[in-house]
């Protein structure tokens, strides 16, 4: 096979890597990864087995024997062959081999289409599996499918990816992206492939043998991986058919097809654009170790096909929120009848005056509208102030801006719907200003009463409680301490002096002096 436009893999043993052709799909170009920092293994054992019903077993593995529905489907795998020049690859013992025979299911075996259009599994395939699948629990995704800002983010939980099905569109794209074959860490064109070819084993596609063992055959990730694998095998067959004269002279540079490919008809399949049935993922599925130094070169654009359907994301739902009719009805303008509008303004004025009389301790801003009035929605611009993600939340103590916006909206809606109601609006504004003046005067009178009580006024006390009277002004007091403090106002005495160095401030009440000394830290 020709290798003019194919990049190479920098292996750990610093050997000259073989070159292989990589698929170029519609909108997606697969590039090579940097060397994986972790050691590679051959056919790792996945703990646990896959339960496959009998119907699904017959559909995926026609060669399997009849098994009960509750039995675990297991297929034996051959002993792994270490790559050439890699001395760090662990050898598989008898116990490890038995473990692999128990846990490797038919779902982990690559498949191709035969002449009848049925899936055929190749149990003899023995490819290298990237260690990141076993260390991190996640298959790889090419970094060029991710944005530059999200290439170094953490991975989602493996249970989240494995649980992605057609019924869960949120995790559907993540599971699909996780099932993309890892083209960089597959051993192609090495001495290992030559030995596998002589033994009847081959490497028809750069997809690891145990790549799908962590997925259920009925999951969406399994379907996507199978679709990508078939597309890659299809392209390899078309490229081999086009380069058949040159491959006779140089057979070591191309990977021969697997044993199952011999049953496929020799007619070359025309190359067609491959549309991968997944979009740009919601979650970045990439190994942090293999993503170092790798920048995306091409981001896929979803095609308008039956597989790439648009799924609304959470950001789209925030930008286009649903309209709450109850909130709209609470701030809707009054009816079109002029008489009802005038009566509504009178009732509103009465409620405002009663609110201002009952809440004397509150500020004048709280008497205009209650704080619980929701913000209005502009139906013409499809804009919601309270739900705009780019505007900070208005749920703070000072709701003056929210109240003013409500007042302005109600006034504008009333003016547009009722041109004859301008006089009532002006009357309402005059009445509101009068209420504010009266409220300020009441607060001023209350402050005067409080000041008089601090100076020793006994106007609020009854005559029965008066036991002591001032000889100067004849004011009555119930306690002698109050009379003594009052006497200082006539004599001008300040017997309590701050003893802090350099201060010397005098007070007529001891508690006031102690409160002052807190400033000095005493």
Curated annotation (Swiss-Prot):
It holds the Pfam family zf-C2H2. A zinc finger (C2H2-type) spans 468-495, 496-522. Residues 311-321, 335-344, 413-427 have a biased composition (Polar residues). SMART domains: ZnF_C2H2. This is Zinc finger protein C25B8.19c. Residues 428-438 have a biased composition (Basic and acidic residues). Residues 1-25, 61-96, 235-265, 311-386, 413-462 are annotated as: Disordered. GO terms for molecular function: DNA-binding transcription repressor activity, RNA polymerase II-specific; RNA polymerase II cis-regulatory region sequence-specific DNA binding; sequence-specific DNA binding; zinc ion binding. Transmembrane segments: none annotated. Keywords: DNA-binding, Metal-binding, Nucleus, Repeat, Zinc, Zinc-finger. GO terms for biological process: intracellular zinc ion homeostasis; negative regulation of transcription by RNA polymerase II. SUPFAM superfamilies: beta-beta-alpha zinc fingers. It is found in: Nucleus. PROSITE patterns: ZINC_FINGER_C2H2_1, ZINC_FINGER_C2H2_2. GO terms for cellular component: nucleus. Residues 84-96, 345-362, 453-462 have a biased composition (Low complexity). The keyword Zinc applies.
């Amino acid at each position: 096979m020709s290798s003019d436009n194919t990049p190479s893999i920098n292996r750990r043993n610093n050997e000259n890597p073989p070159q292989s052709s990589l698929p170029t799909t519609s909108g997606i170009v697969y590039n090579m990864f940097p060397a994986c920092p972790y050691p590679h293994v051959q056919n790792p054992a996945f703990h646990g087995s896959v339960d496959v019903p009998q119907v699904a077993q017959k559909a995926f593995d026609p060669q399997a024997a009849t098994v009960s529905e509750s039995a675990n489907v297991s297929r034996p795998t051959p002993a792994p062959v270490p790559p050439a020049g890699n001395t760090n690859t662990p050898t598989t013992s008898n116990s490890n081999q038995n473990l692999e025979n128990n846990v490797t299911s038919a779902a982990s075996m690559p498949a191709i289409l035969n002449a009848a259009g049925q899936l055929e599994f190749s149990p003899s395939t023995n490819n290298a599996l990237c260690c990141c699948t076993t260390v991190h629990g996640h298959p790889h995704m090419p970094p060029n499918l991710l944005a530059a800002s999200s290439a170094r983010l953490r991975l989602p939980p493996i249970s989240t990816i494995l649980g992605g099905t057609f019924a869960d569109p949120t995790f559907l794209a993540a599971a699909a992206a996780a099932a993309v074959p890892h083209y960089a860490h597959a051993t192609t064109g090495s001495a290992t492939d030559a030995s596998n070819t002589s033994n009847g084993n081959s490497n028809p596609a750069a997809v690891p043998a145990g790549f799908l063992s962590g997925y259920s055959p009925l999951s969406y990730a399994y379907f996507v991986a199978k679709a990508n694998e078939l597309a890659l095998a299809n392209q390899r067959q078309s490229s081999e058919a086009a380069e058949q004269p040159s491959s006779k002279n140089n057979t070591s540079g191309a990977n021969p097809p697997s044993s199952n490919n011999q049953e496929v008809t020799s007619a070359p399949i025309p190359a067609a654009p491959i549309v991968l049935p997944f979009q740009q993922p919601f979650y970045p599925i990439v190994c942090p170790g293999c993503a170092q130094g790798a920048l995306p070169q091409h981001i896929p654009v979803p095609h308008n096909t039956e597989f790439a359907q648009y799924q609304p994301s959470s950001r789209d739902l925030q930008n286009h929120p649903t309209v709450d009719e109850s909130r709209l009805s609470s701030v809707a303008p009054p009816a079109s009848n002029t008489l009802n509008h005038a009566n509504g303004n009178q009732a509103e004025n009465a409620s405002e005056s009663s609110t201002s009389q009952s809440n004397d301790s509150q500020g004048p801003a709280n008497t205009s509208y209650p704080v619980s009035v929701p913000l209005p929605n502009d139906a013409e611009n499809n804009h919601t102030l309270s739900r705009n993600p780019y505007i900070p939340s208005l749920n703070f103590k000072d709701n003056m801006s929210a109240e003013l916006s409500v007042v302005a909206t109600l006034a504008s809606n009333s003016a547009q719907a009722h041109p004859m109601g301008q006089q009532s609006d002006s009357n309402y504004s005059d009445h509101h200003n009068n209420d504010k003046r009266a409220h300020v005067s009441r607060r001023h009178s209350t402050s005067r009463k409080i000041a008089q009580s601090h100076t020793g006024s006994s106007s609020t006390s009854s005559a029965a409680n008066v036991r002591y009277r001032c000889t100067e002004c004849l004011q009555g007091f119930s306690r002698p301490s109050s009379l003594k403090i009052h006497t200082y106002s006539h004599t001008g005495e300040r017997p309590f002096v701050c003893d802090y160095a350099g201060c010397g401030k005098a007070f007529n009440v001891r508690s006031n002096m102690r409160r002052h000394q807190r400033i000095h830290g005493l």
